[in-house]
Amino acid sequence: MNRYAQLFSRLDEANQGAFVPFVMLGDPTPELSLAIVDALVAGGADALELGIPFSDPVADGPTIQGAALRAFESHTTPDDCFELLGRIRAKYPQLPIGLLVYANLVYVRKIDGFYEKCQQAGVDSVLVADVPVQMCAPYKAAADKFGIDSIFIAPPNGDAETLKQVAELGNGYTYLVSRAGVTGAETKAGMPVEGLINTLREFNAPPALLGFGISEPTQVREAIAAGAAGAISGSAVVKIIETHHQNPEHMLNRLKEFVEGMKAATNR
């Protein structure tokens, strides 16, 4: 049983959903991003979704683009990110760790090379944000070869065939997008998603985590009430870093408190 399966099994027994924060590795600096991970885990994060800074993030709104810029300003490279991932894995052996990246980052290392690096660093899953499920074959093959779960986005306007492919090809969890567009806490998650979740369930998809626009505990409660296995929050977490990174101690406290509030909302 892999780490995601163990997590969802444990949460089901506890009658809880998962809360998964997203942050950019290297934001605002590599060392501070390790302290940020510690604060998220201390607040109760069930898993982590982590980004590698990229210069042209098409699915990201201004908040997460800003995180990438801060990471670039602190000279964070992909190699630095893999080194950070290894340190996070060593500290948290049971925590599911996912990467959310763009195809160029994978391609520049050769696809097999990228997934091998993920395996060596202890990464559980990879979501390539700009590769739709219909075009995923080389990425999926490399992921399978190196024991990495492939995460796919179930779009809000996806037809049955797309959702069926997402269900059949995905492992770990399904990234359920609550609305079209780019990431951002400024634009609220579009509910309801029960229909999408039911369709995914019919196709035996991995557990669905709802993302895009999740910034408040009430949205986490609504997602779980709609049948999601949990929720992912990126922009709202990164916004705390953006606002308070000049005062690291205060920032880390705010992050921990935010996660505590969101995690408390996962009780079924």
UniProtKB/Swiss-Prot annotation:
GO terms for cellular component: cytosol. The active site is at E49, D60. Pathway: Amino-acid biosynthesis; L-tryptophan biosynthesis; L-tryptophan from chorismate: step 5/5. Its EC number is 4.2.1.20. Keywords: Amino-acid biosynthesis, Aromatic amino acid biosynthesis, Lyase, Tryptophan biosynthesis. It comes from the Bacteria. InterPro entries: Aldolase_TIM (IPR013785), RibuloseP-bd_barrel (IPR011060), Trp_synthase_alpha_AS (IPR018204), Trp_synthase_suA (IPR002028). It catalyses: (1S,2R)-1-C-(indol-3-yl)glycerol 3-phosphate + L-serine = D-glyceraldehyde 3-phosphate + L-tryptophan + H2O. It is an enzyme of class 4 (lyase). One of its GO terms (molecular function) is tryptophan synthase activity. Pfam families: Trp_syntA. The alpha subunit is responsible for the aldol cleavage of indoleglycerol phosphate to indole and glyceraldehyde 3-phosphate. HAMAP family: Trp_synth_alpha (MF_00131). Tetramer of two alpha and two beta chains. NCBIfam families: trpA. Belongs to the TrpA family. This is Tryptophan synthase alpha chain. It comes from Aeromonas hydrophila subsp. hydrophila (strain ATCC 7966 / DSM 30187 / BCRC 13018 / CCUG 14551 / JCM 1027 / KCTC 2358 / NCIMB 9240 / NCTC 8049).
